[in-house]
């Protein structure tokens, strides 16, 4: 017993890092990366087969709607697509209630402004007003009805009791939507966001989709993408080199981005690295993995930790815009 307790930690520290990692479900998805990339990437290149690339943008805050419309217009224009501004007017038991008419009038004002902004970017807009007793479901249903390729929403800082008990509109849209959802908090106009940071954990289909989305925005805005991969201190050097080589080959072979840099950092706290590195960029694109559980939507641990720190820094030192792609 004494010998085991003494030698155990020593042997573990020396040999544990050399042992093969157990195969998890995520590993199964990422194995044979060279062969599966050939299957994934053609799908990514041809995934948009609608008549128009459609970006649905819920409008509810007149102070933030310009940046959201501007972002959607940049992406839609790059793909020769359209934007669909949608305003959800709260329903009422009696549809002849004056409050319903007031809600519809306010929605129309917001949509008229959205059309004006879209015209500045020479992008077609198809605004809709939806009467619904659930704003989140109204957004998800509108996106499905319009066969939207992307939903763009603003970041919500609602942390009240109701939000903690029942979740926010963002939580519900993330959980129920059929297409990717981009949630953003922009501290500058989208046309000024050119230095883009994309933290990546591994080479998976989700990673490729995130890079493709960042590329779409970078191409529409003459931006430069930096892919950031953080390794812990126990990662063998040959594994780090192999990852960087494979990623470089992926970028070159499939032309994921013409202006793309790779940065590898060894550190035990990925969230701290992302926070520190973000100050050198205009926009950080984070990935949220949709895992539908009985308790709702679960996001990746690193993204959650970064968001907690972002919330902490918002009021005084946070100076970088960010986007979460689900």
Question: Would you name each region that the model predicts?
Answer:
Residues 6, 11-65, 87-92, 149-239, ...:
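Intrinsically disordered or low-complexity boundary/linker segments at protein termini
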Residues 87-109, 229-249:
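Acidic, proline/glycine-rich short linear motifs
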Residues 76, 113-123, 216-221, 248-259:
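Short helix-loop-beta junction
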Residues 1-5:
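Transmembrane helix-bundle signature of multi-pass membrane transporters/permeases
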Residues 135-139, 169, 269-274, 302:
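Short acidic active-site motifs
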Residues 245-249, 266-278, 294, 299:
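A short, acidic, amphipathic alpha-helical segment used as a generic capping/interface helix at domain edges
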Residues 54-93, 100-101, 105-113:
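Non-catalytic interaction/regulatory modules that flank or connect domains
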Residues 146, 277-280:
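Active-site charged/polar residues at nucleotide-handling catalytic sites that mediate phosphoryl
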């Amino acid at each position: 017993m004494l010998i085991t307790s003494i030698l155990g930690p020593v042997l573990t520290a020396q040999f544990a890092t050399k042992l093969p990692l157990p195969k998890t479900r995520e590993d199964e998805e990422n194995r044979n990366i060279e062969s599966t990339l050939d299957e994934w990437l053609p799908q990514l290149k041809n995934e948009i087969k609608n008549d128009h690339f459609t970006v649905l943008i819920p409008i509810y805050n007149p102070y933030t709607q310009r940046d959201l419309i501007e972002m959607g217009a940049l992406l839609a224009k790059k793909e020769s697509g359209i934007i669909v501004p949608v305003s959800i007017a709260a329903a009422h038991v009696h549809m002849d209630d004056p409050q319903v008419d007031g809600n519809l009038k306010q929605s129309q004002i917001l949509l008229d402004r959205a059309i004006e902004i879209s015209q500045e970017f020479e992008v077609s807009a198809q605004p809709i007003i939806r009467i619904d007793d659930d704003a989140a479901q109204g957004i998800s249903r509108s996106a499905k009805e319009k066969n939207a390729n992307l939903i763009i929403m603003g970041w919500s800082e609602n942390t009240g009791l109701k939000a903690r008990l029942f979740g926010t509109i963002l939580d519900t849209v993330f959980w129920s939507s059929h297409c990717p959802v981009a949630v953003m908090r922009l501290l500058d106009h989208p046309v000024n966001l050119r230095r883009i940071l994309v933290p990546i954990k591994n080479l998976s289909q989700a990673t490729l989709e995130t890079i493709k989305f960042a590329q779409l925005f970078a191409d529409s805005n003459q931006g430069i993408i930096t892919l950031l991969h953080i390794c812990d201190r126990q990662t063998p050097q040959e594994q780090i080199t192999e990852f960087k080589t494979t990623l470089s080959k992926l970028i070159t072979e499939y032309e994921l981005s013409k202006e793309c840099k790779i940065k590898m950092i060894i550190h035990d706290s990925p969230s701290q690295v992302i926070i520190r590195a973000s100050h050198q960029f205009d926009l950080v694109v984070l990935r949220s993995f949709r895992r539908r559980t009985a308790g709702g939507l679960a996001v990746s641990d690193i993204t959650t930790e970064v968001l907690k720190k972002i919330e902490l820094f918002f009021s005084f030192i946070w100076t970088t815009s960010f986007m979460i792609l689900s």
